Amino acid sequence: MTRVKRGYVARKRRKRVLQLTQGFRGAHSVLFRTANQQNIKALRYASRDRARRKRDFRRLWITRINAGARKQGLSYSQLMHRFKKCGILINRKVLAQLALLDTKTFNQLVFYTDL
């Protein structure tokens, strides 16, 4: 049987994994086996946290809207009910930015729902 010269195939594969784990602490960026395990774990966390990030931002927006609404003497749910009843279709992200950065406009929107 003839000898198979693999050349740089294994080195290339290991180098690719080690490049992905640059910046990890300790052996996780130096030793191939632990680096490979950490890379798999990091990818798993990344896919999980993409969904979690959407949840977290929605939660933050609701908290900010609630804070702005309570300054007007309303709860978050009462405010959103009024918006829906009046046909105001502004998403939570924009409402949160208004409540945080442009309180005058946010207060006018809340006042408009009273009419």
Swiss-Prot record:
Its main location: plastid. The keyword Plastid applies. GO terms for cellular component: chloroplast; ribonucleoprotein complex; ribosome. GO terms for biological process: ribosomal large subunit assembly; translation. Disulfide bonds: none annotated. It comes from the Eukaryota. It is found in: Plastid, Chloroplast. PROSITE patterns: RIBOSOMAL_L20 (PS00937). Pfam families: Ribosomal_L20 (PF00453). Keywords: Chloroplast, Plastid, Ribonucleoprotein, Ribosomal protein, RNA-binding, rRNA-binding. GO terms for molecular function: rRNA binding; structural constituent of ribosome. SUPFAM superfamilies: Ribosomal protein L20. The keyword RNA-binding applies. PANTHER family: 39S RIBOSOMAL PROTEIN L20. Belongs to the bacterial ribosomal protein bL20 family. HAMAP family: Ribosomal_bL20. Binds directly to 23S ribosomal RNA and is necessary for the in vitro assembly process of the 50S ribosomal subunit. It is not involved in the protein synthesizing functions of that subunit. This is Large ribosomal subunit protein bL20c.
